């Protein structure tokens, strides 16, 4: 079976205790046992902080998907970044996994050289900043089936501790720069991105949890299965909206620069592994990044995006000769911007809307050019909720009456 990696900037999980007890079919037994000791289970539940990694429907959908995947016995990981004030009092359902920590790099420059042995092109990132991504794993309990999946939440830590030698030389800023970078990434979950520094922080946050998640999934896959060229046979990366779509060029980078695959082999794997869920029909809400920011912060990723765009536009011009208007609409790089939704559609094997009408509007209006060129990718997956949390747990009297 394939393992689903559900990449989302938001997971609006809610409290876990009551939900876990219901899914273990133990809620009534535990409630009655506590009542015999004059303890109210609801009071205990109220002590648990609300696990709110998000603020809207996007995050709640992601949480419901994790519940459903575990209940239907699909192996799955949710992947997200953690804000710094996340559950200050601790979380009994959370396990720190220091052994799976990954380095994530930002900025610097890319040096190109030929490997003297293999003759392959090598791209080396230099003069970069980096942080360690440390995962915390939370169990996602399936309903009545003894299945437990995982929500992996990434925290940022400095690679090295405070640099006392730099401080002693009077260079205070250099002494604390790594600590500041790590703190900044997790301090604010939704930075205001109507100015440059807010955009930069948001892009750092997105790349941070995506790079860490992909490094971890490749490591896990190789230990179990070996041949990285067959990754798509065992793994699906589901991108929940445009925020995680930097997963496309990051997977390409890992396959080419780290695993040594050719561009063609890496693209074959990536385009069979990545899938994209679209949540909006508003063109202005489809994420775009200024090229000057994107290329400065993620220089190697930008090179890969350029090549994806170049190769794709060759195909567009072959299929629609002389139609530069179509090229302009479908390009990933246009008017000084990186258009993330376009990249997700080009690279994914599946593009889904979240309601029948929504999907039809995507196909006939907003993404019409892509649908005409690659209709086989488009499909609908109507959203739903987990009735256990919102009915059985939220309104047990109504649930009893219905059943």
Task: Give names to the regions the model predicted.
Residues 1-403:
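A conserved ligand/cofactor-binding region detector
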């Amino acid at each position: 079976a394939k393992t689903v990696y559900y990449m989302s900037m938001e997971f609006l999980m809610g409290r876990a205790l009551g939900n876990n007890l219901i899914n273990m079919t133990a809620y009534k037994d535990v409630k009655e046992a506590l009542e015999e000791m004059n303890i109210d289970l609801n009071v205990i539940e109220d002590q648990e902080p609300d696990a709110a990694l998000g603020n809207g429907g996007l995050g709640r959908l992601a949480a419901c998907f994790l519940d459903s995947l575990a209940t239907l016995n699909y192996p799955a990981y949710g992947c997200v970044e953690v804000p710094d004030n996340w559950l200050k009092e601790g979380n009994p359902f959370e396990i720190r996994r220091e052994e799976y920590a990954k380095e994530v790099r930002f900025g610097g420059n890319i040096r190109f050289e030929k490997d003297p042995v293999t003759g392959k092109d090598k791209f080396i990132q230099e003069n970069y900043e980096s942080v360690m991504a440390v995962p915390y794993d939370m169990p996602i309990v399936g309903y009545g089936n003894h299945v437990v999946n995982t929500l992996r939440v990434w925290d940022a830590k400095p690679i090295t501790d405070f640099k006392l030698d730099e401080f002693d030389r009077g260079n205070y800023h250099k002494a604390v720069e790594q600590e500041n970078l790590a703190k900044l990434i997790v301090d604010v979950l939704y930075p205001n991105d109507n100015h440059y520094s807010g955009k930069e922080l948001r892009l750092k946050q997105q790349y941070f949890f995506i790079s860490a998640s992909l490094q971890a999934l490749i490591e896990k896959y190789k230990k179990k299965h070996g041949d990285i060229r067959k990754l798509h046979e065992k793994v699906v990366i589901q991108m929940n909206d445009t925020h995680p779509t930097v997963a496309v060029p990051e997977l390409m980078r890992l396959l080419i620069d780290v695993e040594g695959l050719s561009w063609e082999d890496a693209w074959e794997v990536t385009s069979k592994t990545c899938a994209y869920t679209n949540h909006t029909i508003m063109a202005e809400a489809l994420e775009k990044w200024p090229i000057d920011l994107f290329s400065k912060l993620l220089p190697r990723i930008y090179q890969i995006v350029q090549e994806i765009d170049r190769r794709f536009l060759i195909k567009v011009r072959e299929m629609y000769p002389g139609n530069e208007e179509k090229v302009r609409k479908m390009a990933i790089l246009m008017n000084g911007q990186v258009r993330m939704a376009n990249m997700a559609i080009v690279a994914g094997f599946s593009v889904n809307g979240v309601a029948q009408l929504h999907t039809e509007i995507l196909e006939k209006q907003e993404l019409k050019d892509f649908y005409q060129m690659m209709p086989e990718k488009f499909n609908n997956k109507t959203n739903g909720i987990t009735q256990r949390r919102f009915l059985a747990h939220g309104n047990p009297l109504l649930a009893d009456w219905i059943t």
